[in-house]
């Protein structure tokens, strides 16, 4: 209504609105008027750790009359669905903030303050956790014993340490830990280590994890399914949507992964499973039924644009780059064809090779490595990128 805008340019109204807006947020000037008593602050939002700016939130806590010793925050944006408090429970066991950062740091996440700071060990852990993390690194016998620790975070750390030590029985241990542990931090650690390092063996755990009782595990599981692309996961993926489609964040992850599986197979599986259900409100099912065919057509257009001789280099670059964040199985063959095409522009061939390096969680990445290992070209820049991609696909994740 026009009445809403009547006072839009009134000086008093502008002043009043600005005060309301100012009071809705916390600014560095507000913090400097306080005396913060928190020794360590973990910020889980964008820009709070922007130490490269003259004025920033983390600095306002550190350079203050208060008692804050260390902070952790992001310089720009925070990635979604991360696990920022992984191993946080070990702070109660006296783990140094620097060690906490070493095991949990994400891109653009920074520790500002004293990394040697630690709290008093009041968790009942009968060891120096900081000494163990350094002196016992690689000691399989020691960390296997910690699997029986009364602390859930210590059990999770034991799994991480055994992974770092390349323990020979790790895959079965991780599966056992996921299926049998009552602690969500242990289950999530097991799931992550399996999905990140053993994509060919993780299918059975992912099938279960998409309906885990802990919401973050469910969301991580759907994200890993998107990167794994194993067609065996399709029935469980559809079932998770029928069970959890009413959850906004779970639904968002499902729709983000809409191109993971063959669209026709996914549509048939959805119809098959939905036929056995009784719905109070089936609108969310109908939404996916309508979305799958639309996305199929959209993906076909994308591939047609890549193959079209009329497409510009910039257009093809844009399409190829999408498969870095969305490494779907259907894009592998087109990317390999671009790499092998000697008449194709060099920058597109290099980009295609680099993009395949993002398939490090793909269940059948061994086939990609095999294809790239047999590839030969006189173009040294392209060959260097192919070699880097092979190394990316073979590398171990933390």
Task: Give the positions of each predicted feature.
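Catalytic cores of nucleophile-dependent amide-cleaving enzymes
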Residues: 1-85
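C-terminal, active-site-flanking charged/polar segments
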Residues: 59-68, 85-110, 201, 214-217, ...
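Short inter-helical turns and helix N-cap capping residues of alpha-solenoid HEAT/ARM repeat scaffolds
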Residues: 150-151, 182-183, 213-214, 245-247, ...
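Amphipathic alpha-helical repeat scaffolds
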Residues: 144-148, 156-160, 175-179, 188-192, ...
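Active-site proximal loops enriched in glycine and acidic residues that flank catalytic Cys/His/Asp
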Residues: 44-47, 73-76, 104, 115, ...
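Caspase-like cysteine protease fold
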Residues: 84-168, 187-189
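Structural detector for internal amphipathic alpha-helices that build alpha-solenoid repeat scaffolds
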Residues: 131-132, 155-165, 185-197, 218-230, ...
């Amino acid at each position: 209504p026009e009445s809403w805008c009547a006072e839009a340019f009134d000086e008093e109204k502008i002043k009043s609105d600005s005060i309301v807006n100012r009071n809705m947020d916390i600014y560095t000037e507000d913090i400097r008027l306080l005396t913060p008593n928190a020794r360590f602050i973990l910020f889980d939002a964008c820009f709070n750790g922007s130490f490269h700016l003259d004025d920033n939130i983390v600095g306002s806590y550190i350079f203050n009359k208060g008692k804050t010793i260390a902070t952790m925050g992001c310089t720009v944006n925070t990635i979604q669905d991360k696990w920022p408090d992984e191993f946080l429970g070990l702070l109660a066991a006296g783990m140094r903030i620097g060690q906490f950062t070493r095991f949990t740091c994400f891109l653009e996440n920074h520790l500002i303050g004293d990394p040697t700071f630690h709290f008093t060990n009041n968790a009942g852990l009968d060891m120096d956790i900081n000494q163990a993390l350094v002196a016992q690194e690689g000691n399989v016998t020691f960390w296997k014993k910690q699997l029986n620790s009364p602390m859930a975070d210590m059990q999770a750390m034991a799994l991480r340490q055994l992974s770092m030590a390349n323990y020979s029985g790790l895959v079965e241990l991780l599966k056992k830990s996921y299926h049998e542990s009552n602690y969500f931090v242990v289950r999530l650690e097991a799931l992550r280590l399996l999905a990140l390092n053993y994509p060919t063996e993780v299918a059975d755990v992912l099938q279960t994890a998409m309906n885990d009782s802990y919401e973050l595990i469910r969301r991580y599981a759907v994200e890993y399914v998107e990167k794994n692309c194993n067609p065996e996961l399709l029935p469980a993926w559809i079932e998770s949507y029928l069970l959890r489609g009413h959850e906004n964040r779970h639904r968002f992850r499902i729709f983000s992964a809409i191109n993971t599986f063959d669209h026709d197979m996914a549509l048939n599986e959805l119809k098959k499973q939905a036929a056995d259900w009784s719905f109070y409100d089936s609108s969310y099912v109908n939404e996916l039924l309508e979305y799958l065919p639309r996305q199929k057509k959209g993906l076909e257009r994308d591939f047609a644009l890549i193959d079209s001789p009329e497409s510009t280099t910039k257009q093809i670059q844009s399409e190829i780059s999408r498969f870095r964040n969305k490494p779907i199985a259907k894009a592998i063959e087109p990317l390999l064809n671009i790499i092998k095409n000697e008449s194709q522009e060099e920058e597109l061939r290099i980009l295609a090779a680099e993009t395949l390096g993002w398939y490090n969680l793909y269940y059948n990445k061994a086939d990609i490595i095999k294809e790239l290992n047999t590839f030969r070209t006189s173009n040294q820049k392209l060959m260097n990128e192919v070699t880097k991609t092979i190394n990316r696909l073979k590398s171990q994740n933390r």
